[in-house]
Amino acid sequence: MTNKELFYFTGKCLSLDDHPEFGQEIVRLCKSELIDWQRFVELCNGHLILPLVCLKFRSYDLLRHLPEELATHLKDIFELNYHRNEQILQQLDAITRTLNKHGVEPLFLKGAANLLDGLYSNIGERILSDIDFLVQEKDYLLSAELLENEGYAMVEPFSGDIATEKHYPRLYHPDYISIVEIHRLPVKKDYQHWFNTGLIEAEKKPVGSLSGCYVPSDNHKIVHNFIHSQLANEGYLYGTVSFRDLYDLYLLSKRTDLSRTVEHIKSKQKVVAYFAFARLTLGLDDTFYPHRNFNFRVLTKKHSLNHQSRFFYTAFRSAIFISKRIFGGYVFQFLKSLYSKEMRRSIVRRLRNPRWYKDHFNFYKRFFSN
């Protein structure tokens, strides 16, 4: 299998519930030895979906057809993630109790919200990176103080203005398993005019299994999924998509109509492309989402080229990244500093802070190491 073929094979594995007959194709491929299972594991591991793959294969009695070592590995990963998510649920409870004592009710986001809201068939299905939650702006710094009083601390020192950041610097606790991000804003300021705390609060849902906290409506979860995947993480720009995001979208589409959600999203051409790409990747029919557009063809082409050529992936990604940093970052900030005293102060403050240089270097290092 080529990289592209392996990617789409993996997508159909995730949506076996919609086409269980694909299980027979998996059995045939197992017998033919056409799949490089090492590459399959590397792909799934990179997208953080090994526990999900294990659950799908187990549900359709496919594990016994895999190489024994692979089947054992998948089972072990699933069990580890199951127990990890049990601990995360306990951490979510502890966070909620701590904040509730002072009148703060967190609104959990992303994977934590989906886990609490029963989106997954099994708590071991989804790997959670961080615990993200949103609070009212008046409770932002208070929430951080309350958690820090309980033993949480910053993962690393922060050199900026915490009060104006989208979220508080990442926090960890030696007795808990997950990193925590306290959000003042749900998304970057670029998207605040059409997706903000007020909108989310208006449709938030209480969590049945944990009183004192909330999650976004399914409609807003989909909007946030798109913004996170294709705008904030620039998936559309680079031609990259996460299987975790696609799978969450797939499950949410069973609760709400994607065509209606599009009406609430300003970047309509890109969201149509994203939904259409999800349909293609997961091997679904038009009941998932019936539309396609030019942007879909662009996204698909960039994604295909990324798989076909490592050189294209590296060169294309690096060219965009460097251009954005030079013209969208350095040049823009310099020009703005000519008329903005606040920007001049910000630049001087950063240039005088040794920590800023280290953070800057690490930022570039993380990007080019991927």
Each model region followed by its residue ranges:
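Conserved NTP-donor binding/palm subdomain of two-metal-ion nucleotidyltransferases/polymerases, i.e.
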Residues: 1-129, 135-370
